[in-house]
């Protein structure tokens, strides 16, 4: 495995570990998700460059669209939770409460 792939895989694993450790605050979770999406974007771009396939060339663009949607929804939730509760704890996102 080339060194660049190993570094990107390590970046994804560190972001995933951060997501598991810092899961109590929404802002920390969003930052870890963005790190995971960035490493997936770089990995898919490198794969598209190495395979020379026209079908896989659109994959990094689609991944960027999903990352932008995830960031927009996450920031909207963060603003809503911060305005309502004053904190960004994830346990405030429980939708089953009456």
UniProtKB/Swiss-Prot annotation:
Q: Per its database record, what is this protein's job? A: Core subunit of the mitochondrial membrane respiratory chain NADH dehydrogenase (Complex I) which catalyzes electron transfer from NADH through the respiratory chain, using ubiquinone as an electron acceptor. Part of the enzyme membrane arm which is embedded in the lipid bilayer and involved in proton translocation.
Its chief place of residence is mitochondrion
A GO BP entry is: ATP synthesis coupled electron transport
GO terms for CC?
mitochondrial inner membrane; respiratory chain complex I
Indicate where this protein resides in the cell.
Mitochondrion inner membrane
Q: Which UniProt keywords apply?
A: Electron transport, Membrane, Mitochondrion, Mitochondrion inner membrane, NAD, Respiratory chain, Translocase, Transmembrane, Transmembrane helix, Transport, Ubiquinone
Biological classification of the source: Eukaryota, Metazoa, Chordata, Craniata, Vertebrata
Q: Which organism is it from?
A: Hylobates lar (Lar gibbon)
Q: How does it assemble?
A: Core subunit of respiratory chain NADH dehydrogenase (Complex I) which is composed of 45 different subunits.
Membrane-crossing residue ranges in chain numbering: 1-21, 29-49, 61-81
The protein's name is NADH-ubiquinone oxidoreductase chain 4L
Which Pfam families does the record associate with it?
Oxidored_q2
Enzyme class, top EC level, equals: translocase
What is the primary gene name for this protein?
MT-ND4L
